[in-house]
Amino acid sequence: MLDVERRAAPEQVRDDWSGLARRALVPAGLNSPEFMIPQFRHMDGAELASVRESGALVLALPVKRRRFPSAFLANWVTPLNVSGLPHLDYNHGASALEAFLRREAAPVMLTGIPADGPFWDALQCAAHRLTIVDRWERAALRPNGSFETWYETNFERKRRKEYRRLRTRLSEQGRLECLSLKPGENVAPWISNLLDLEAAGWKGRRGTALKSRNSVTMAFTEACRDLHSAGKLRFWSLVLDGRTIATMFATVEGSGAWLGKITHDETLAKFSPGVLLILDATETFFSEAGITCVDSCAVPGHPMIDNIWRDRVAMADVVVASANVSQKKFDFTVRAENIRRNLRTTARHIFYKLIRRHRS
């Protein structure tokens, strides 16, 4: 018997959720309880959708009801996470998804989900209706062999020489160190350095830095603490004469890892500290046993990471539904979502055009 429910306070099921993550069909680190429960605590309007089989949790996904232009359910998109990949029990993937969809009298939107692999197969099996509203590929790293071999084969000699030159020039500015967060180390300074460095750059000036909203700052801080306590947080920093000039974090779950925020001192941009930090982090992923794929979580065609990590992961945004949802209602939701996305893209282009005109 499959029981479906939604709750606004998932703290009560933290242990069950953590257990589900350990036996998940595929790792879903961006929706881990350590990462998401602090966001529930400090941001409003979301619930945890869950499915149980004989009392055991077999599906967990943070969701939020959307009501315009039509009512439907979607994975919870926050300033920290846009992934709609749920935790699914390895032995109940398709059946749990089917029960979740059947519970809804409206379509369900899942954004930023893998467009191939076991979860995709289970979703196609469970959904009576499925439409892809967007599909893309983004950079990823699949560590295999040694970092040295990867580095030699991934970059031509000219590029390797340029990276050495950048690191040498940066080292000439002072004592350069690459540091990584150690198990049991106090994570608070790492969090503060990332928040402060990001706020000092263009995101701070635009008002989109994590530090621009107190609720986001608090959620991020608590999430990093919880992830670190669970052994699921990775952090790297480039430090020049004791001052952090670039920093980045990642979440890890099972065989997967996902890059989080990366930020750098913009006054040192000519030395490409972000690129150097990515290379240092890449080396550590090659030395970490069990990691088979690192998702960059970057936009497709990203000018930096796409030229460093050559592997790709296929992603998609989809609208799905059970047979309980009429074809008419489903089609209307898909059309409305496509219109909304087109309007958003147009508005963004106009905004950036006005910004460029204002600066010129």
Question: Where are the regions a protein language model picked out?
Answer:
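Short intrinsically disordered coil segments
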Residues: 101, 153-159, 331-339
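ATP-hydrolysis module of ASCE/P-loop NTPase motor domains
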Residues: 101-119
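Short catalytic-loop micro-motif centered on adjacent basic/acidic residues
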Residues: 108-110, 179, 293-295
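A conserved beta-strand-loop-helix scaffold within acyl/acetyltransferase catalytic domains
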Residues: 3-54, 58-71, 113-134, 138, ...
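A gly/proline- and charged-residue-enriched helix-loop-helix capping module
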Residues: 77-104
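Active-site/acyl-donor-binding loops of N-acyltransferases
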Residues: 124-148, 289-360
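Aromatic (often tryptophan-rich) hydrophobic motifs at membrane interfaces
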Residues: 95-98, 210-327
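Acyl/amide activation-and-transfer machinery of modular secondary-metabolite enzymes
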Residues: 76-85, 133-138, 175-177, 312-317
